[in-house]
Amino acid sequence: MTIISDVYAREVLDSRGNPTVEVEVHLESGVMGRALVPSGASTGEYEAVELRDGGDRYMGKGVQKAVDNVNEKIAPELIGENALDQIGIDRLMIELDGTENKGNFGANAILGVSMAVAHAAANALDIPLYVYLGGFNAKQLPVPMMNIINGGEHADNNVDIQEFMVMPVGAESFKEALRMGAEIFHNLKSVLKAKGYNTAVGDEGGFAPNLSSNEEALATIIEAIEKAGYKPGEQVKLAMDVASSELYSKEDGKYHLAGEGKVLSSEEMVSFYEELVSKYPIISIEDGLDENDWEGHKLLTERLGDKVQLVGDDLFVTNTKKLAEGIEKGIGNSILIKVNQIGTLTETFDAIEMAKRAGYTAVISHRSGETEDATIADIAVATNAGQIKTGAPSRTDRVAKYNQLLRIEDELADLAQYNGLKSFYNLSK
């Protein structure tokens, strides 16, 4: 029933028109599982390797090498294996690759297979993916972290901070949270139009206006929240992904906020955040400092770690070794989980488990280059992570995840939980 009969990969396109890997895993029973792999714009230097072809084809971004690795190297080894043995299959692929960073086959090749195997197994058992991955205890719907103003690497504007997000913590259900986010998003469009700003959207569906400062982005979102009829700080909190590694200069060891014409030291960046947190209801800051600025992260954690979720993305890259080091040094209090940063479902789940045991939160995340694949929605519920970051309620590649969560909430019915503010269980103030 669940024995793998074929594994097949093909090159498809992501939401930015760049190639990515799609994998199908076929079982002897005739059941098939399919998965598509995402891709990031701002990437941590310690991420698993995303294999690209180089050359002229697709301007060097082709993934035919990764596709060939699946079809010619991975597939022959997996045929005859049991799709229910997720851990065994993931470990086998890691062993076959033989590198620390999956640079031989490519994390995009390995991840595509890993996710497709899980889909095939769930389909064979005729149960939802979140139930297959999480068991009977998978019932918590995540608070959405909705990116509604884009800057940095995700937009062509003069806003330095990469993402400004809203989190509807005061909702009673995921369905209500999504509605609140969508209403705020549409009101933000009206507010921006009234101010004469562009309402074109960036990679993740949020608006990308040429605002005069990062603080203006926060003030404009507050205006939109109020215009939508909600109370900032009570029903809706703010979150930011600074993606500071993109602002950091190795030459002078400073952070260059070009949009504001400022050059700041690590300590000045921490003070900058303290000022913003004192003025606005910010509950989460991601990658507030460069991925190698551990002293700066330590200072940020000491100053704000009891009242703000400090998320490590480039800092931890969904890697248990990096996370363990951060936990030991008391750096951050949360990890961003991106399946393609590490390259298998098994390692992804290991990172989530390690974070939770240490009292860190885990935020399940998309990438800026996405597809219609909604696997991360199921992962969020399977792990009871409590938070998901998957863009604005705009663009099908983002909305696909939200719609899947609506379906899951419907399926769970009375068992569904939406914890809102309680999802930030490690904040004391």
Swiss-Prot record:
Any GO BP: glycolytic process
Reactions performed catalytically: (2R)-2-phosphoglycerate = phosphoenolpyruvate + H2O
Binding-site positions, Mg(2+): 241, 286, 313
A cellular component annotation (GO) from this entry: extracellular region
Pathway, per record: Carbohydrate degradation; glycolysis; pyruvate from D-glyceraldehyde 3-phosphate: step 4/5
InterPro entries registered for this protein in UniProt: Enolase, Enolase-like_C_sf, Enolase-like_N, Enolase_C, Enolase_CS, Enolase_N
Active site: 204, 338
Cofactor binding, per record: Binds a second Mg(2+) ion via substrate during catalysis.
Homology family: Belongs to the enolase family.
Protein name from the UniProt record: Enolase
Gene: eno
